[in-house]
């Protein structure tokens, strides 16, 4: 019998996550939930503590870590290739120019290299750090199998065809997700990452403008007028739109919750891609369910985040354990 994605009270548990793991590729089968139990038993605790410590001095780093995992996994899989520095690498692509959180990953790696040299991959660190960032903001704890190896290839040319731009249509987003083995449900659920984090004004200010008299003029009619006015005020013409940031979620920006979906119902999605989810029946119905049931969102997030974290993983000779996350060995 096929599993139903939504029910009145979904009960996705550790067992369902394990079942999902077993159904995926043979490479994934080489991962395990206790991969470092013998070789580096404190690995996950070190990741968690370092993330918490970094966020105490810079709370914005949590949203940055979550965004970072999307930009890694969607471009040739969760292999840590987005972390590599250098001309022509993924990290050098303009589409990744605003990424952050790299220093936290390097801090974790430096500590682990002291206690467990050459053991824990940067790919695993990145996935665990994103998982812990969500937990630190009140989100669900996602069981993550580890044992990923680090990729040796990082090419800027691979970035643009694989990441979603803020003006994409639902069809374009579905096509990219489908190419990664992710469903429409995964698209809507993982878009919930926008319940935290912030965005630069130039990523959404094409949705409105001021007329010659200084009055607001909506270019995107799907945007709530009062919310658009708030965005205009925060993205004043006197400020640099490439450096000025606005919270993705205007209501509960420091909490991982289902407020993002409630915002969409009120036509207060920051990006065109957010608002687009309300314009298509395939996605709108899922938004409505998640907006009304945070438990359902957390259950769905656990499943979809796990699926994303298993995309294109490297194991064995397919990769390496980098000594530094910013460079191949």
Curated annotation (Swiss-Prot):
EC number of the protein: 1.11.1.7
PROSITE patterns the record matches: PEROXIDASE_1, PEROXIDASE_4
Residues engaged in binding Ca(2+) 2: 195, 249, 252, 257
Reactions the enzyme catalyzes: 2 a phenolic donor + H2O2 = 2 a phenolic radical donor + 2 H2O
Membrane recorded as keyword: no
Keyword annotations of the record: Calcium, Disulfide bond, Glycoprotein, Heme, Hydrogen peroxide, Iron, Metal-binding, Oxidoreductase, Peroxidase, Secreted, Signal
Listed CDD domains: secretory_peroxidase
Cofactors: heme b; Ca(2+)
Residues reported to bind heme b: 194
Primary subcellular site in the record, as a coarse category: secreted
Record's signal peptide: 1-29
Binding-site list for Ca(2+) 1: 72, 75, 77, 79, 81
Pfam families (alphabetical): peroxidase
Gene3D superfamilies per the UniProt record, alphabetical: 1.10.520.10, Peroxidase, domain 2
Any single GO BP term: hydrogen peroxide catabolic process
GO terms assigned for molecular function: heme binding; lactoperoxidase activity; metal ion binding
UniProt binding sites for substrate: 164
Record-linked InterPro entries: Haem_peroxidase, Haem_peroxidase_sf, Peroxidase_pln, Peroxidases_heam-ligand_BS, Secretory_peroxidase
Domain of life: Eukaryota
PANTHER family the UniProt entry points to: PEROXIDASE 6, PTHR31517
Job description of the protein: Removal of H(2)O(2), oxidation of toxic reductants, biosynthesis and degradation of lignin, suberization, auxin catabolism, response to environmental stresses such as wounding, pathogen attack and oxidative stress. These functions might be dependent on each isozyme/isoform in each plant tissue.
Family per record: Belongs to the peroxidase family. Classical plant (class III) peroxidase subfamily.
Additional detail: There are 73 peroxidase genes in A.thaliana.
Protein name: Peroxidase 18
Taxonomic path: Eukaryota, Viridiplantae, Streptophyta, Embryophyta, Tracheophyta
């Amino acid at each position: 019998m096929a599993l139903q994605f939504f029910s009145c009270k979904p009960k996705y548990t550790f067992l369902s996550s394990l079942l999902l793991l077993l159904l995926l590729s043979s490479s994934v089968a080489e991962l395990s939930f206790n991969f470092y139990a013998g070789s580096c038993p404190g690995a996950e605790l070190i990741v968690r503590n370092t993330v918490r410590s970094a966020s105490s001095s810079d709370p914005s780093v949590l949203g940055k870590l979550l965004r970072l995992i999307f930009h890694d996994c969607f471009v040739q899989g969760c292999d840590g290739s987005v972390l590599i520095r250098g001309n022509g690498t993924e990290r050098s692509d303009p589409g990744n120019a605003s990424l952050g959180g790299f220093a936290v990953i390097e801090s974790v790696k430096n500590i682990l290299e002291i206690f467990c040299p050459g053991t824990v991959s940067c790919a695993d660190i990145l996935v665990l750090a994103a998982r812990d960032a969500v937990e630190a903001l009140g989100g669900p704890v996602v069981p993550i199998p580890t044992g990923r190896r680090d990729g040796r290839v990082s090419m800027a040319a691979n970035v643009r065809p694989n990441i979603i731009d803020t003006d994409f249509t639902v069809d374009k987003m579905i096509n990219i997700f489908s190419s990664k083995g992710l469903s429409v449900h995964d698209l809507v659920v993982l878009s919930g990452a926008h319940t935290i984090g912030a965005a630069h004004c130039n990523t959404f200010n094409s949705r409105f403008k001021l007329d010659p008299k200084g009055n607001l003029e909506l270019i995107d009619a799907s945007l709530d007028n009062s919310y658009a006015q708030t965005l205009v005020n925060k993205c004043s013409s006197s400020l640099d739109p490439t450096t000025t940031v606005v919270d993705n979620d205007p209501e509960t920006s420091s909490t991982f919750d289902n407020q993002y979906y409630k915002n969409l119902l009120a036509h207060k999605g920051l990006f065109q891609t957010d608002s687009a989810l309300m314009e298509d029946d395939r996605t709108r119905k899922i938004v409505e369910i998640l907006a009304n049931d945070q438990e359902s969102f957390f259950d769905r997030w656990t499943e979809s985040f796990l699926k994303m974290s298993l995309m294109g993983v490297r194991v064995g000779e397919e990769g390496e354990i980098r000594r530094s996350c910013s460079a191949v060995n």
